[in-house]
A protein has these predicted regions:
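Nucleotide-state-sensitive switch-loop elements of NTP-binding domains
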Residues: 22-33, 37-124
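Conserved nucleotide-binding/hydrolysis micro-motifs of P-loop NTPases
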Residues: 60-63, 115-116, 136-139, 160-164, ...
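Conserved beta-strand segments of the P-loop GTPase G domain that flank and frequently precede/overlap
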Residues: 57, 79, 112, 130-135, ...
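Conserved ATPase-coupling elements of RecA-like P-loop NTPase cores
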Residues: 118-123, 140-143, 164-168
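Inter-motif core of Ras-like GTPase G domains
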Residues: 119-136, 147-151
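P-loop NTP-binding site
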Residues: 23, 27-32, 44-47, 210-253
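Extreme N-terminal, non-catalytic leader segments
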Residues: 1-28
């Protein structure tokens, strides 16, 4: 399924324009964590610094966040995964997103993805990987998120004004326990706190490389549920199956 972007004239315009230097930033995180609001403030900071950002918003069924970004005067495209995993959809559309960003003569492509699975970390190796997480999800949330957080370069913590200082400190320690190498930014999607710091990291992020690879392997292979099987219980399913006690088996040819 191709990305559905804003009208851009000739479909072939700009293709193969790989000579232009371009940075890629992938922003993922838990639903409702404030990814879009934080990113909008970061876009404003990048614009003030003279950079030309472009945004691709990946969502599941519906979004109007593209209208919010359009008000900032930046190129924006939308991709709806629909019946597919939004992170998988984002991963295999990276080439189209980069082509589109070059057509827009952007300096940096900001890819905001839905990040619903948590186990599917959509970060290529040649990007700045940003995980946005909501502190109100509880002190142990960073330990539950998985590769979405553990392979991120930057973890942006939102809604810190809704909890105590002690809770924020515990949350921070849990993040570092899961990912000791990451940078942590405390952000506020309403006031814009932390946006300038995030924009500075984006400016210093890596340029897009050739033959990019994912930082972490995806979950186990496709099962019959992925291909549309509706019946419950293992007797109706094939592929790699995991039991409640952790035992794994392969069922099928």
């Amino acid at each position: 399924r191709r990305l559905a972007d804003e009208p851009a004239g000739d479909d072939q315009a700009g293709r193969g324009g790989g000579g232009r230097s371009l940075k890629l930033v992938v922003i993922a995180g838990t639903p409702g964590s404030g990814k879009t609001s934080v990113l909008m403030h970061a876009v404003k900071s990048l614009q003030r610094e003279g950079l030309r950002p472009a945004v691709v918003k990946i969502d599941c069924l519906w979004t109007e966040d593209d209208k919010r970004f359009q008000r900032l005067g930046v190129p924006v495209a939308v991709g709806l995964a629909k019946d597919m995993c939004p992170d998988h959809y984002s991963i295999y559309n990276v080439d189209e997103m980069l082509e589109w960003a070059r057509e827009q003569e952007a300096d940096v492509l900001l890819n905001e993805t839905a990040g619903l699975c948590l186990r599917c970390a959509p970060y290529p190796d040649s990007c700045l990987a940003v995980c946005v997480i909501d502190v109100t999800t509880g002190p142990n949330a960073p330990l539950k998120v998985g590769p979405l957080l553990t392979t991120a370069d930057v973890v942006v913590v939102t809604k810190g004004d809704m909890v105590s200082q002690a809770e924020r400190e515990v949350f921070r320690e849990r993040i570092l326990e899961a990912n000791p190498r990451c940078g942590i930014i405390e952000a506020n999607g309403l006031t814009g706190k932390g946006a300038a710091e995030l924009a500075e990291l984006i400016r210093g992020g890596p340029e897009v490389g050739e033959n990019m690879l994912l930082r972490h392997n995806p979950p186990l292979a496709i099962c019959t549920l992925c291909t549309g099987e509706l019946r419950v219980s293992k007797e109706h399913h094939r592929g790699v199956l995991r039991h409640l006690d952790g035992f794994m088996e392969y069922s099928g040819e």
